[in-house]
């Protein structure tokens, strides 16, 4: 089959890789939630060969991911998992979770579900990295983000750029502590949380 292509993956993969190198250096098993085309997975798995990179997606997107994984044939990219966040989740636990450009596509109920289920798939000291655009103090960080949010809502009113404070509140309830909020190109962010770390320790 013709492999799906997301040009944004080529634009953002190097900056994201920098964050992953910093925070996933001592990690071993990554669950990527919403792997999309699979292009991020093969790039990060090739660059970070110490990681076992587990992709996941809704059923209709799995063939495209398999096509990329089959072509690259990396030893650290197992068969993608079917994951609808409102349905059944994996039974395995991971010491790292990664998700890019998903929270603004999901409905808010789905975002809540993700954070509610994260403790079930995370080890005691697991880390979560979420990449994408976020609002702060209820405000867009750029005119381009405001335009992007309007475009998202034309596609579906359940979509939209999320408020950082609301997402972080879900993370806190799930037992996660924000340890970095890194600015990324094109008005995006990488939010990094760790489980089992107090906010005081994270800011020390």
Residue ranges and their predicted role:
Residues 31, 39-87:
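Class I SAM-dependent methyltransferase SAM/SAH-binding core
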Residues 141-165:
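Conserved Class I S-adenosyl-L-methionine
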Residues 176-204:
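Core SAM-dependent methyltransferase catalytic element
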Residues 125-137:
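Conserved beta-strand signature within the Rossmann-like core of class I S-adenosyl-L-methionine
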Residues 1-26:
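Class I SAM-dependent methyltransferase Rossmann-like catalytic core
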Residues 89-97:
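A short acidic, Gly/Pro-enriched loop at the edge of an enzyme's catalytic core
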Residues 26-36:
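Conserved class I S-adenosyl-L-methionine
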Residues 106-118:
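A short, conserved alpha-helix within the catalytic core of class I
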């Amino acid at each position: 089959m013709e492999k799906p292509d997301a040009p944004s993956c080529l634009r953002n993969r190097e900056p994201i890789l920098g964050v992953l190198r910093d925070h996933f250096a001592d990690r071993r098993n990554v669950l990527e939630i919403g792997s999309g085309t699979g292009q991020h997975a093969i790039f990060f798995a090739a660059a970070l060969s110490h990681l076992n990179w587990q992709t996941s997606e809704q059923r209709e997107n799995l063939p495209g991911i398999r096509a990329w994984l089959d072509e690259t044939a990396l030893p650290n990219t197992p068969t993608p998992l079917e994951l609808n966040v409102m349905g059944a989740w994996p039974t395995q636990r991971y010491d790292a979770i990664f998700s890019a450009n998903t929270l603004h596509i999901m409905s808010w109920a789905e975002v809540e579900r993700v954070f509610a289920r994260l403790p079930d798939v995370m080890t005691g000291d697991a880390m979560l990295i979420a990449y994408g655009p976020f609002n702060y103090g209820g405000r867009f960080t750029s005119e381009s983000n405001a335009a992007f949010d309007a475009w998202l809502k034309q596609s579906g009113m359940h979509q939209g750029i999320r408020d950082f404070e609301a997402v972080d509140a879900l993370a806190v309830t799930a037992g996660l502590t924000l340890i970095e909020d890194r600015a990324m190109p094109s008005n995006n962010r990488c939010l990094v949380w760790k489980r089992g770390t107090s906010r005081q320790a994270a800011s020390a």
